[in-house]
Regions:
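Conserved alpha/beta-domain cores
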Residues: 91-97, 101-349
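Acidic, glycine-rich flexible loop/linker segments
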Residues: 1-134, 138-152
Length: 349
């Protein structure tokens, strides 16, 4: 199965095939968002064997080596040996006409999820009227920035953490700049760092040793950090807004990147960019207020220094039951709400 750490490989894949999983698994959800063909949960340990060292996979007695062709059908879940001839899908004329009638009469805007400039361009091409969720953590896994992210996580002092964040900020700013150029004045809601930190750390011994050497730590010291950050229950653990409460410099860095990008694109295009900043996993109004204060202080200083008149909004996602129950109090500090129905459903039932 896949995890957030696999996002770079998934982005360059022509198709995704996993042994474990289903329609709502990580592989299926991410592939659907990227428009990549995916078959998730194709079997079990009895009919699928994977030799990672030899780069060989055996499915129901059929063996595939690295470089061999296989074809997958995301609609039926079928997996075929060899390369099957395909044609690009086309938009049905009757469907296009029907959707035109719907567009002429609807009163609801349809947005999409997009985590990078490529997704944003696809969204615009497909007629999306905005980005309802941009998950910034997916930007962190790129090969050119994951090292700095890991240095930030394993930092022993605030100074070390800020130095690592200073390396990450230009990458985030570049991503947001590219996305704002594509989206123009269409709304884009940017969710701050959400997953628990252990998801960004290396798991292979050689990667841990390399990171330890880069940071001037022993492998044992770094292993202790990795173990200390491991979450017993990642859904409810040290993640979301709790990361920004513990390490406000993370929220400060992300605010720098968002606002600088918005100011730059507004100046370039003359369009009014209004950043929508989402603080994730809030369950109590004090959490939102703490992080919002960091965001507002940072954003206002940047806007004043640039001498521009820029509006921005700070909101949150209602995704845990406590947030739903205290929504009236949270609303006093939030400019907007989004609903995270997947986590909310799992925590409720």
């Amino acid at each position: 199965e896949t995890s957030p750490e696999d996002i770079v490989g998934m982005q360059v894949s022509q198709g995704i095939l996993t042994v474990r999983g289903g329609m709502t698994s990580h592989a299926a959800v991410v592939a659907r968002g990227m428009g990549t063909c995916c078959v998730s949960g194709c079997g079990n340990d009895n009919n699928v064997a994977i030799d990672y060292d030899a780069k060989v996979i055996t499915i129901n007695g059929h063996t595939f080596h690295e470089g061999d062709w296989m074809s997958i059908d995301g609609s039926t879940g079928n997996v075929y040996e060899g390369q099957i001839a395909t044609v690009a899908s086309t938009e049905n004329a009757n469907f296009k006409r029907f959707m035109g009638w719907a567009d002429a009469n609807r009163q609801m805007k349809v947005m999409t999820n997009a985590d990078n400039p490529r997704d944003a361009q696809n969204a615009v091409d497909m007629g999306a009227e905005g980005i309802g969720l941009c998950r910034t953590e997916h930007m962190f896994f790129a090969e050119d920035r994951i090292k700095a992210v890991r240095e930030m996580i394993c930092a022993r002092t605030v100074e070390e953490r800020k130095a690592a964040l200073a390396k990450v900020e230009p990458f985030q700013e570049a991503d947001f700049t590219a996305m704002y150029r594509i989206m123009g004045e269409r709304p884009m809601t940017i969710r701050y760092l959400d997953p628990p930190l252990h998801e960004f750390l290396p798991t292979k011994a050689e990667d841990i040793a390399a990171l330890a050497a880069d940071m001037g730590m022993t492998t044992e010291e770094l292993n202790n950090v990795v173990v200390s950050l491991h979450e017993f229950n990642p859904m409810m653990g040290h993640r979301g807004c709790r990361l920004a409460v513990t390490y406000p410099e993370i929220a400060e860095m992300q605010t720098n990147a968002v606002i600088k990008a918005a100011i730059k694109v507004s100046a370039e295009t003359g369009k009014m960019i209004t950043p929508h900043i989402m603080i994730p996993l809030v369950g109590e109004v004090k959490e939102l207020k703490f992080v919002k204060d960091v965001v507002v202080k940072t954003a206002d200083a940047l806007i004043a220094a640039a001498g521009v008149d820029m509006k921005y909004e700070v909101g949150t996602m209602i995704e845990i039951p406590r947030a739903a129950l205290t929504a009236g109090e949270i609303a006093k500090e939030a400019d907007f709400f989004s609903f995270g129905t997947n986590d909310l459903t799992q925590m409720t039932f």
